[in-house]
């Protein structure tokens, strides 16, 4: 039985909704027809933004929620989820920004970026200072999109920034009601208060205020391009299809996508697209068995049947995974979901199990079941994000490069205390031998590579330097061929005192995406905390100092967020 993590006990059949009147081109669409109820909701929101008067059941639920927040689970009693702390500085939300021109204040933007768009996703709660506990991961999704003008553009002469919320069902519902309705998953489910919030949520469902068929996720984590469609992702819901207007940079939510009814539950925020076959590989994790379900899509977007994985020991929080040409690789960490601990011990829904030994599971990439699944113990290896995986020795050895979270107990609390070390794990499939080698002495996370090498042996990775996490104070380029040297760093860029960035992204400088692996540019948003200004920065990936070749001053502050991508002009024009 599949159970949505954020709702704990509610079944979640997909019911896809189109959120914009724009219809796709003649290519196959992954978005099902709109429901009448959602069209009515969208119409109401188009005419007004003020809160809808509460019905009696809704008013009762709202009152109980306030009692929980003010007398049972006070934010000030749990500083790590106090919104006054969590949403301070550049973690504070910003307003939406319509397409707005920006100025290139340094250098010139490389031609390989012309006509393309850099998009970064991240949390941005629509209710500025929530009157309840709040974790950074609980904010509504907002895309910050920077469109670079093409050489032939007659409409744009400068880059254009646009910041828009992803119009999830949760976002629209809480925008209409004027306040929080669905509980925060990471901060809200804690002890007696968490149980009480679950009861209130059940009451809201029974009263018809919440329709779980329409989802409850945030779409605040990442964005991916697959089969000519852009998707905003979060592991608590289905993907949301997005559109970036290549003429003016406007960002539009098209709808919640179930891939023609084949994807009936949520999906990881970190699917892997094979750059050769163009297939997309993904999974979801769950509170009850099967804890992990694996699946993939062909290059046209058709989903293959689920592969339930029942050999997982406990409901481990599995945020990311990796693929090689022949295998899918799953990391089992010590971070687990345990509803009974919340109920019986008054702890959080997600916690640390120090008795567990982390494992890595290896499954044939096109497996129809888990009969050939193998698990390998990797002590003290707790992975949140993967960088890449590949095979060596004619497929007898698996290599995985990933930041190892050395203090994973802080991930859901004092994130600034987290330290991550980039490790290379080697698994010999014949002997069962496992080794783990550090690639740098620094605390590095948010690693990216040339996307043309996903699942295949590559040499270079670009990582954010903890500033502390989740802020990034610099970028490091690692050469994986130097493994065993103690420090594989071959390129470095520090942003300076008080200047921080988000996850970098590598953009190859050649049209087809191949050639010299590090021939291209590293891009990201940066923020100067003293002045409150934000920039888009382009760095030469080949230079030892990751020299800045272009800098764009942005008209709005970009809060610290999560993951992003760069979509080249041809891909942008081909999107559905």
From Swiss-Prot:
Alphabetized InterPro entries for the sequence: Carotenoid_Oase (IPR004294)
Cofactor binding mode and count: Binds 1 Fe(2+) ion per subunit.
Any GO BP: carotene catabolic process
Catalytic activity as recorded in UniProt: a 9-cis-epoxycarotenoid + O2 = a 12'-apo-carotenal + 2-cis,4-trans-xanthoxin; 9-cis-violaxanthin + O2 = (3S,5R,6S)-5,6-epoxy-3-hydroxy-5,6-dihydro-12'-apo-beta-caroten-12'-al + 2-cis,4-trans-xanthoxin; 9'-cis-neoxanthin + O2 = (3S,5R,6R)-3,5-dihydroxy-6,7-didehydro-5,6-dihydro-12'-apo-beta-caroten-12'-al + 2-cis,4-trans-xanthoxin
Cofactor: Fe(2+)
EC nos: 1.13.11.51
GO cellular component terms, semicolon-separated: chloroplast stroma
Location(s), subcellular: Plastid, Chloroplast
Keyword vocabulary terms for this entry: Abscisic acid biosynthesis, Chloroplast, Dioxygenase, Iron, Metal-binding, Oxidoreductase, Plastid, Stress response, Transit peptide
Transit peptide boundaries: 1-34
GO MF term set: 9-cis-epoxycarotenoid dioxygenase activity; carotenoid dioxygenase activity; metal ion binding
Function: Has a 11,12(11',12') 9-cis epoxycarotenoid cleavage activity. Catalyzes the first step of abscisic-acid biosynthesis from carotenoids.
Name the UniProt record assigns to this protein: 9-cis-epoxycarotenoid dioxygenase NCED2, chloroplastic
Source organism (scientific name): Oryza sativa subsp. japonica
């Amino acid at each position: 039985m599949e159970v949505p993590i954020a709702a704990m006990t509610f079944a979640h059949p997909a019911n896809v909704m189109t959120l914009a009147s724009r219809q796709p081109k003649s290519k196959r669409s992954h978005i099902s027809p709109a429901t009448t109820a959602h069209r009515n909701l969208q119409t109401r929101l188009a005419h007004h933004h003020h809160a809808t008067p509460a019905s009696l059941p809704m008013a009762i639920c709202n009152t109980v929620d306030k009692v929980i927040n003010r007398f049972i689970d006070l934010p000030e009693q749990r500083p790590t989820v106090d919104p006054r702390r969590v949403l301070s500085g550049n973690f504070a939300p910003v307003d939406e920004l319509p397409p707005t021109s920006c100025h290139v204040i340094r250098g010139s933007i490389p031609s390989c970026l012309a006509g393309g768009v850099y998009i970064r996703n991240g949390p941005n709660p629509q209710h500025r200072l929530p009157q309840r506990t709040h974790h950074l991961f609980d904010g509504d999704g907002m895309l910050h999109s920077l469109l670079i003008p093409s050489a032939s553009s007659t409409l744009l002469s400068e880059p254009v920034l646009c910041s828009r919320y992803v119009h999830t069902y949760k976002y629209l519902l809480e925008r209409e009601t004027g306040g929080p309705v669905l509980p925060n998953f990471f901060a809200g489910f804690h002890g007696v208060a968490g149980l009480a919030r679950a009861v209130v949520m059940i009451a809201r469902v029974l009263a018809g205020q919440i329709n779980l068929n329409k989802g409850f996720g945030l779409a605040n984590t990442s964005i991916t391009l697959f089969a000519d469609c852009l998707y905003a992702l979060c592991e608590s819901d289905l993907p949301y299809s997005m559109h970036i207007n290549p003429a003016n940079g406007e960002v539009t939510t098209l709808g919640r996508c179930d891939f023609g009814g084949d994807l009936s539950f949520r999906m990881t925020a970190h699917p892997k697209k094979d750059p050769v076959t163009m297939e997309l590989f993904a999974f979801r994790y769950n509170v009850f068995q099967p804890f992990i379900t694996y699946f993939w899509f062909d290059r046209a977007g058709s989903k293959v049947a689920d592969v339930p994985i029942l050999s997982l020991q406990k409901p481990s929080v599995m945020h990311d995974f990796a693929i090689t040409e022949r295998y899918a690789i799953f990391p089992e960490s010590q971070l687990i979901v345990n509803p009974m601990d919340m109920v019986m011990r008054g702890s959080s829904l997600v916690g640390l199990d120090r008795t567990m030994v982390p494992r890595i599971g290896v499954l044939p990439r096109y497996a129809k079941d888990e009969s050939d699944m193998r698990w390998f113990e990797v002590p003290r290896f707790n992975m949140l994000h993967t960088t890449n995986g590949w095979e060596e020795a004619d497929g007898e050895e698996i290599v995985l490069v990933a930041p190892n979270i050395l203090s994973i107990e802080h991930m859901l609390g004092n994130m600034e205390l987290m330290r991550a070390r980039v490790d290379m794990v080697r698994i010999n499939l014949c002997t069962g031998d496992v080794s783990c080698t550090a690639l740098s002495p620094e605390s590095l996370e948010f690693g990216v590579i040339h996307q043309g090498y996903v699942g295949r042996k590559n040499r270079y990775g670009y990582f954010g330097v903890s500033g502390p996490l989740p802020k990034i104070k610099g970028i490091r380029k690692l050469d994986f061929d130097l493994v065993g040297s103690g420090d594989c760093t071959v390129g470095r860029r520090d942003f300076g005192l008080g200047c921080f960035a988000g996850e970098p992204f590598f953009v190859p400088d050649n049209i087809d995406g191949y050639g010299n692996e590090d021939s291209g540019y590293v891009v990201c948003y940066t923020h100067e905390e003293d002045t409150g200004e934000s920039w888009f920065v382009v760095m030469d990936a080949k230079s030892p100092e990751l020299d800045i070749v272009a800098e764009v001053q942005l008209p709005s502050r970009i809060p610290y967020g999560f993951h992003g991508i760069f979509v080249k002009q041809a891909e942008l024009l081909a999107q559905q």
